[in-house]
Amino acid sequence: MRLNELNREELSALYRSQMTRDFPPQELKPLKSMLELMEEGRYQALGLFDEEELLGYALVWREPGVPFALLDYLGTLPGVRNRGLGGQMLDLLADYYREERGIFGEAESDEGGDPTDRELRHRRLGFYLRNGFRYGGYDCALFGVHYQALIRGTADVSPEELLEVHRRFYQSRFPAHIYERFVQLPLAPGETPNPPGNWMEE
């Protein structure tokens, strides 16, 4: 298996056919936002292929001069799930970005939120923690959703360094009024996420 970069058309097709089914609306960036970042050279769509068959995908946000990669979305296609492909894809990503200090991301916290989804959130967190990620040292809230910061990288990455990098990604993308309203980095213990907003308000 290998990772191949997808182009704009392939990302657009993947978004419409799979991602809108795989992720709830409040967690999914607009396609327009992804394509703009890709046009700027700041977003990579990687497909997991077995020969010519697409099995999964990883969307990764990059910032110039920042030695970290933000894993924005990870998914496998229907029909090939529960085969360990997610863990294999994380290993391939770690090799793909081996020159960087780490890959980090956000996994929805199992605290708060809709109690009917709590078990799913708990399983997602466990998946990342079983596959080389560790807690980054802080929680955050993005557009009303409570996340935990996770990282797979060198052991010397401190929570302070990761938080600074994490802020840089979002501050570079959103105007100050959107950032202040919808991005809470970090989310202090006991603090409540701000009311959710529409990604399109950017």
Where are the language model's segments positioned?
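Short amphipathic alpha-helix that is part of the acyltransferase structural core
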Residues: M1-S33, E161, V165-R168, R181, ...
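Active-site rim helix/loop that mediates acceptor-substrate recognition in acyltransferases
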Residues: R21-E51, L59
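Conserved beta-strand in the GNAT
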Residues: G47, E53-R62, F68-G75
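A conserved beta-turn-beta hairpin within the catalytic core of GNAT-like acetyltransferases
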Residues: R62-L71, R81, E99-R101, H146
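A short, internal acetyl-CoA/4′-phosphopantetheine-binding micro-motif in the GNAT/acyltransferase core
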Residues: L74-R81, S109-E111
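Conserved acetyl-CoA-binding loop-helix of GNAT-fold acetyltransferases
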Residues: T76, N82-Y96, L120
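Conserved GNAT acetyl-CoA-binding A-motif
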Residues: Y97-L120
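C-terminal "cap" of GNAT-fold acetyltransferases
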Residues: L120, A141-E202
